[in-house]
C-alpha cells in the first residue's frame, strides 16, 4: 500500500484501543497515536471526525473508522488496499 497518513485516536485505558494499536504494529503500519484523554483539542477533533465520543477512531487519509475491533479494522484496511490497487473502484 502506498504511504498513508494514519492517525489513531485512543483513550489510554481503552482495551479496544490497545487491540487497534497491536493490529497496526503487527501489520507494520506507521501511525500517530493521539491520546484524547490528555488532549482536549484532539478529543474535540475525534468527535468532529467520527460524530461520537467513543474510541478508538482511526483516520487514514481522511477516511474514518470509529468504535471498531480488530476484525473491522482488517476489513477497513483491506478496502483501502483494494482502492490503492484499483483507483477506479472508488
Regions found by a protein language model. Name each.
Residues 50-58:
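Structural micro-motif
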Residues 22, 26, 56, 75:
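Surface-exposed charge patches
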Amino acid at each position: 500500500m502506498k504511504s498513508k497518513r494514519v492517525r489513531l485516536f485512543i483513550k489510554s485505558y481503552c482495551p479496544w484501543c490497545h487491540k487497534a494499536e497491536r493490529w497496526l504494529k503487527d501489520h507494520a503500519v506507521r501511525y500517530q497515536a493521539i491520546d484524547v484523554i490528555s488532549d482536549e483539542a484532539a478529543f474535540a477533533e475525534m468527535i468532529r471526525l467520527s460524530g461520537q465520543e467513543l474510541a478508538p477512531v482511526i483516520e487514514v487519509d481522511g477516511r474514518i473508522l470509529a468504535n471498531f475491533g480488530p476484525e473491522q479494522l482488517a476489513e477497513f484496511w483491506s478496502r483501502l488496499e483494494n482502492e490503492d490497487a484499483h483507483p477506479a473502484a472508488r
